[in-house]
Amino acid sequence: MQTNTQFTGLEKRIDEAAHRLLDNLPRHRISDALTEFLVFGLKQAWACLFGGAMLGLIILTRWFWPEGGAGFITRYDFLFLSAVVIQLGMLVFKLEAWEEAKVIIIFHIVGTAMEVFKTHAGSWIYPEENFFRIGGVPLFSGFMYAAVGSYMARINRIFDIRLNHYPPLWTTIVLAAAIYINFFAHHFVWDMRWVLFAATFALYWRTSMHYRVFRFRHKMPLLVAFLLTSLFIWIAENIGTWSKAWLLSLIHISE
């Protein structure tokens, strides 16, 4: 069982209620495996709370937003203001720790800056007009990056993640810097993403992630975790493309 210091107040009460319910179930290998699988899915959904809410709003506005606009507010501004309200609500109702909110702010700022560059470079466009924007970038877009930051911070906390055979920190810093540089530089020079993929594999192929689900700790290669996370981000990006939140060709999985 995780220590209570890793939970918000609400999460602590949920965890205690889950133990009261599930600890009374008959114990054998099948029921233990099913319990771990169920709790794993629920915790993943909890970690994706902000990102799931944002993606849900993007889909709903794709289906139900008036074709000519809502008059008093644009779709992009509605998404931006909704994201702000969701974040405030998560903090007020203790669905999120303050440390996670700080991560979200950082990811939003960095993500918005990246969006400004990418739209200027012509990678994609935001076709609709709105008020809350910087250049051609509506501010709701930064919250899509923030959703990734939220997930990373929350999953590390609620799964009590520990890493074995992690390479020296400086190597991660160098790799991250190279990835960000390539994000901008590949518009002007050779795209080295495949070199970066190879470097990522070389650095982390021995690293394993240990995490607690409910009763037991489990182990997963860190590269598998990277792959699964990237896959779901790719799916979410293509849902955003389908919803016409931005305009570009469907994103290739190598992106």
For the regions a language model picked out, list residue spans one by one.
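Hydrophobic, lipid-facing residues on alpha-helical transmembrane segments of integral membrane proteins
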Residues: 52, 56, 101, 105-117, ...
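Membrane-interface helix-boundary motifs at transmembrane edges
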Residues: 91-102, 156-167, 211-220
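Residue-level detector of conserved catalytic or cofactor/ligand-binding positions
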Residues: 249-255
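Central hydrophobic cores of alpha-helical transmembrane segments in multi-pass inner-membrane proteins
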Residues: 80-91
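Alpha-helical transmembrane segments in multipass membrane proteins, preferentially the mid-helix core
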Residues: 86, 149-157, 179-186, 198-217
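Short aromatic-rich membrane-water interface segments that cap or initiate transmembrane helices
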Residues: 130-144, 254
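Transmembrane alpha-helix boundary signature
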Residues: 67-69, 92-101, 116-128
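N-terminal membrane topogenic signal
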Residues: 34-51
